[in-house]
Amino acid sequence: MAKDNDNETRTALDEINESLTGLEQKVQNSQRTIMWVILAIGVVVCAILIWIYAIRRPGMAAADNAVGQADITLSTGNDSTALEQYRQVADNYGYSAGNRAALNAAILLYKDGKYEEAAKYLDKYDATESVIGAAAKSLQGDCYVNLDKLGEALGCYDKAIKISDENPLYTPYFMMKKATVLREQKNYSAEAAVYREIIKDYPMYGAQNGIEMEKYLKRAELQAEAGK
């Protein structure tokens, strides 16, 4: 009987030992997995740090220096040289400096009457502030008007209106541009609708800018009625 008990005890101990051995093996395997995960994370972190300190920061510094030089050139009145400098920054760099360079290049190109190229640089510009972003989109619309691409112009003015976020100074200004294009397209009913919206939402705009909004509206309504 004692021998049976001894055998049972040994069997139980063996089972425990086997369980412990299996558990130890699982722990070792888990430790290896964790080690490889940590190593992989370390490699990724190192790559990110290298990108930030060896590539991104020097790139940002170079872009800032280049656009700063273009700003100095522009301040001396040498627009053509400044334009080339802005174009180089916009074409070769990202970051905020490249973004601003794209906008400045577009403005100078527009002044030179190079509307198609100006519109392309405005496509590169990523607005970070509502008023400037809306003005940039409006300028792109002006480019398309000069290229007789009225549909594209309307799209730009609609975006400018949305981006300007009901700014009482700028939103109705962009709406007036939209109405002008609609008039050019002889879409008088849509033109009238824009004037009504300005009068309703920005009642002081006309008086503040010397624009007789009611007369503009009446004219559009009469022409819309005549065209039916």
Show the residue positions of the predicted features.
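N-terminal positive-inside, membrane-proximal cytosolic segments immediately preceding the first
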Residues: 2-40
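Short solvent-exposed coil/turn linkers within tandem alpha-helical repeat scaffolds
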Residues: 57, 89-98, 124-134, 161-171, ...
